[in-house]
């Protein structure tokens, strides 16, 4: 199914200068393979990487967005950390999947994107990824607890991707400190294991889209947000 259009992407791009592409996955893996250039051995690669049909479709949908919508011919490579990158194309890339949706994001600086489908699972697991003071933030907003839990989980995933540091823990090292609802921004403190001080505060933009929440974090997000206002 073609790229999803939503004003939410326009809102978030005011703060983070990137290109966002979405795909509502209604096709089979074979149909998605048929949309990809034959010059790449995607059929063999996806068969070797994934047994699950759902995971195959998520992976292939991102490649369809890359080649058919973003019009980039270069395949995505992966670092040892698991983060995606291009060898030759001068763009940073981040990807995410949730349920039957896929997201591809392209920018000119390191960043992380995440999408998370709405549901009760995140709320049931808050003790695993939110500190007590983070849970208290929901009472200072108009966001419903279940929706806030999904937002918090997604925001921490976006920060983790932007940091590209496998030693970071979502609970211990990434802490949401403030929610600015009018600007749809979160202030998140990141404490690397190598830090001797109090860490850094990064900005995470968010938007509640019809089927999922979208979050986006730049490593230099505070400067980017400040200069975009």
Task: Give the location of each predicted region.
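Core catalytic alpha/beta fold that binds nucleotide/phospho-ligands
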Residues: 1-229
């Amino acid at each position: 199914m073609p790229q999803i259009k939503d004003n939410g992407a326009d809102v978030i791009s005011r703060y983070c200068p990137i290109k966002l592409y979405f795909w509502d996955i209604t096709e089979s893996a074979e149909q998605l393979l048929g949309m990809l250039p034959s010059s790449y051995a995607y059929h063999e690669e996806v068969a070797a990487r994934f047994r699950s049909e759902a995971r195959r479709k998520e992976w292939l949908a991102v490649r369809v967005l890359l080649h058919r919508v973003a019009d980039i011919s270069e395949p995505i490579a992966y670092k040892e950390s698991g983060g995606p990158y291009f060898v030759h194309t001068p763009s940073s890339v981040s990807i995410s999947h949730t349920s039957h949706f896929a997201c591809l994001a392209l920018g000119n600086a390191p960043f992380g994107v995440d999408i998370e489908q709405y549901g009760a699972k995140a709320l049931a697991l808050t003790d695993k990824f939110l500190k007590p003071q983070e849970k208290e933030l929901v009472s200072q907003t108009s966001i419903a607890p279940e929706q806030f839990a999904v937002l918090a989980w997604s925001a921490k995933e976006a920060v983790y991707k932007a940091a590209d540091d496998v030693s970071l823990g979502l609970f211990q090292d990434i802490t949401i400190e403030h929610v600015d609802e009018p600007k749809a921004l979160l202030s998140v403190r990141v404490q690397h294991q190598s830090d001797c001080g109090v860490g850094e505060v990064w900005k995470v933009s968010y938007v509640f889209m019809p089927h999922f929440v979208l979050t986006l974090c730049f490593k230099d997000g505070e400067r980017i947000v400040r200069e975009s206002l």
